[in-house]
Amino acid sequence: MKRSLFILSLVIAAAKFLPAANSLEDVLNQQYKNHTYTLRQSMTAPTQQYDSLGNSPTASALGPWTIYARVQIKKIKLEPARVIVEGQRVGMKFDPNQGVLAETKLKETVKLKISLNEPLESADQFHTILGHIFAFSKEDFLASLPEFWRSCVKGYLKSYSNDGSTMRFDVSEATLKVRQGTSEKAAAGLESSDGHRVTAPQPKKISDPSYTKAAKSQDLEGTVVLALTVDETGKTADIRLVRPLGLGLDESAAETVKTWLFRPATKDGQSVKIEMSVEVDFRQYK
């Protein structure tokens, strides 16, 4: 009998000294597991270091947000001086059936190691820390985007939940034009506001864009629509995204178009700067 009481006492004593972090870890996993959030910095590294204010002492190269920004949390592990968040990358690609950007799971995983300057004691404290690393608000999400993307997303982002776990896009005007076969192209002859005839720029040096690994793995095909300026020398500038394709192909299209050369537009025989839109097609030939 005394032996049984002694063993029971040991069990109770051991239970008293179990670290409180274990129960908090369970709470955090229940709260965040399988939820998807947008990183403020779309770093490409599979393992990333952060402090509790979201600063990264070992910041890696940045990549397209449609490949590297969205992360679905799979596991949270608490340690005495840090939190480890394991996740799966979630891409954004154009869905031709809906005519919008939509989520698609990628094979790549990512691990976030967050150092703590004080013990983690509550779920609210952890949420505050995550808010420095992920864009929980629509404003923070838009601010995290490259300028190239911002006006496009701002115009067609339908909804962004309070914590950023869900986002929805509207069908853009550019998408409707592509569907209807009426997308803007440089016309053979244009008329300026003062009635003078303007000849459109003509392609002189055009190269094809490259596919991203993520886009290839998803068999993504389609058309990126860009707005740009062709200056008096035939060079492109002020490239802006009008209709995206996702999975890094938009950045690939823009980088390629930067190298294009045109015979410049002319007005009364003189070279002039002109704004136009171009379509960049992505097709996989097997």
Segments predicted by a language model, with ranges:
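Acidic, low-complexity proline/glycine/alanine-rich linker and hinge segments
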Residues: 170-217, 255-257, 286
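Extracytoplasmic
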Residues: 32-34, 43-45, 68-73, 78-82, ...
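N-terminal secretory signal peptides
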Residues: 21-79, 160-163
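Bacterial N-terminal signal peptides
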Residues: 5-16
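A beta-hairpin/wing motif
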Residues: 173-177, 181, 218-234, 268-286
